[in-house]
């Protein structure tokens, strides 16, 4: 199919979809959840083909982990769809308004954006997450997954489209581009007459490609070079458990801890404890502040600007909070940053000085997630400042219009 035709169909579907209320949209979402469960064997069989292809291509274990679906993960996706159905529909919500001195009644109402293009790599869960959030907010969506998710996405999109038909909603409100040819993506990125927003979910290269080639507004984010600063007053035993959670719970995610900053005053006491705890969890430390033994490698400055997405952790000894903030400004990606401390004033100073979508005091960076933030399944995590920042839930997929009413009112 020509990309122009696909985008035109999406635009028409978005106009139709915007006319449906919350009841019809929720019916479609609940049908999607049911179909995911009923067709789980078919979905997992397709996913197994994608996993086999990925292994044959020598794709990293971190990427394969993102690609993998199992019964538990698939059930989690279905549950997320049901949770989206339970959320309040932001469309039509009156943000603010009133009657002006002129007598004009004015309201600012939330409305769908229109058509969303989402580009992602080895993340089949994104197919359903994005589709459900877009449907809830009355947006059509074009899904362009990576070649690694070819078989899984084909089944998932079929499930969604059948659910839309069952619910009486436009089937073409959710479409997929299955051809991995990048020339087709380039064509899509120029169709600003029909597509209203581009959301890339992948590595830094994908985000840069979209920024450089799109005539459509692009949401930049998802690159998580996340830091945690252990200040000298921190509870060291609790800190070790929190660091373990932030690094090892699911290393391949963008909200995983990548660089640990330790205040110099406690480094001699804390670093040996850290080394023992991380060794027990098979985490390799990259640092110049510990004797090189098994599980400890030299620090690589270039790697401090990248996501590990694996059981690797940079460790840097820092003089004080000011130096920690300077380090984060130099190496961070404005995603999620944390401080562990018992000093409230220093904590507030850290929050004020660190520029990131999410800043944590004595909590794991792993909380930067739409579900954990109470937003439902997220469409992305934005690290930019315009339109949306942080986990993007339902409201981030809407814009607003001014609705003005008078009694044949004229401007004087």
From Swiss-Prot:
**GO MF annotation: an example:** glutamate-5-semialdehyde dehydrogenase activity
Q: Which UniProt keywords apply?
A: Amino-acid biosynthesis, Cytoplasm, NADP, Oxidoreductase, Proline biosynthesis
UniProt catalytic activity: L-glutamate 5-semialdehyde + phosphate + NADP(+) = L-glutamyl 5-phosphate + NADPH + H(+)
InterPro entries, per the entry:
Ald_DH/histidinol_DH, Ald_DH_C, Ald_DH_N, Aldehyde_DH_dom, Glu-5-SA_DH, GPR_dom
This protein's pathway reads: Amino-acid biosynthesis; L-proline biosynthesis; L-glutamate 5-semialdehyde from L-glutamate: step 2/2
Q: Give one Pfam family.
A: Aldedh
Tell me the compartments it is located in: Cytoplasm
Q: Which CDD domains match?
A: ALDH_F18-19_ProA-GPR
Family to which this protein belongs = Belongs to the gamma-glutamyl phosphate reductase family.
- Which HAMAP family does the annotation name? ProA
The protein in question is named: Gamma-glutamyl phosphate reductase
Species for this entry: Actinobacillus pleuropneumoniae serotype 5b (strain L20)
